Amino acid sequence: MIIKTEADIKTTIPADDSIKGVQKQVLIGTEDGSDQIIMRRFIVEGGGHTPAHSHDFEHVVKVESGNGVVIDNEGHEHPVSAGNSLFIPPNEKHQFKNPHSQPFHFVCIILNPENSG
């Protein structure tokens, strides 16, 4: 069993021109012995966004704090806030944005892309 505290978690800033104001934390991952799933936290600063993207695996998201917007396959914006849970099917294009001034935090659980095939 692995139990981690906030002090154990490293924060990285993804280096990609399609990302703005986003911090990423791997809460549980392969370094912890989890070969099949990865749990990550994203912190999106006010005015920030993740890239619009899709992938060939499903994943679930839990909004921890703040308010944001999820943009779907068709470009529709869906407001989300603390307590909301999302299911994103495989190959569905999506993007998270924070049009507000306060940070927007969410946890994302995915299949390990290296072992999901």
Residue ranges and their predicted role:
Residues 43-45, 55-70:
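Short, conserved beta-strand element in jelly-roll/cupin
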Residues 74-90:
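Short acidic-glycine-tyrosine-enriched beta hairpin
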Residues 50-52, 70-71, 88, 94-100:
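Short beta-strand His + acidic residue motifs that chelate non-heme Fe in jelly-roll/DSBH
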